[in-house]
Amino acid sequence: MELFKSIVAVIGIIATIYFLIKKAETRTVLIGVGLIMSILTLNPMGALDAFAKSMTSGGLIMAICSSMGFAYVMKYTQCDTHLVHLLTKPLSGLKFFLIPIATIITFFINIAIPSAAGCAAAVGATLIPVLKSAGVRPATAGQLF
């Protein structure tokens, strides 16, 4: 049975990658493949139980709300624009190293904010505009988060 579950998992990962490359809706692909995998492994409620358990954590909601609030205040006060102008010139000479540096910064922020949505809100409000202004393509900058 464990071998069957492993095979289902590998096929599910391959199917997910295939549909994402074909530009299918990300959320639909992930929930669909997850539900199909849980049904095939004879645990149809397993995926939903894990999702519900992770969403009911009070710390998760607080982290997401505070990060979204931070991003909104940065945008509303236009601090993000000023930060971009301040950092663009010094960072434009580091084009080759900007992606690894941004990845490392995001990793360290993700330690403090364990939620992916909260981390993306906190880092995306500042790093993506900085990367775009420094010459990194928008699609590449958006893939970091």
UniProtKB/Swiss-Prot annotation:
Bilayer topology annotation: Multi-pass membrane protein
Entry keywords, A to Z: Cell membrane, Membrane, Transmembrane, Transmembrane helix
Residues making up the signal peptide according to the UniProt record: none
Annotated compartments: Cell membrane
Membrane-crossing residue ranges in chain numbering: 1-21, 28-48, 54-74, 96-116
GO CC terms, sorted: plasma membrane
Entry keyword DNA-binding: no
MF term (GO), any: C4-dicarboxylate transmembrane transporter activity
Main location as per UniProt: membrane
Keyword NAD found: no
InterPro entries hit by this protein: C4_dicarb_anaerob_car (IPR004669)
Domain of life: Bacteria
Family (UniProt): Belongs to the DcuC/DcuD transporter (TC 2.A.61) family.
Name of the protein this chain belongs to: Putative uncharacterized transporter HI_0586
Species: Haemophilus influenzae (strain ATCC 51907 / DSM 11121 / KW20 / Rd)
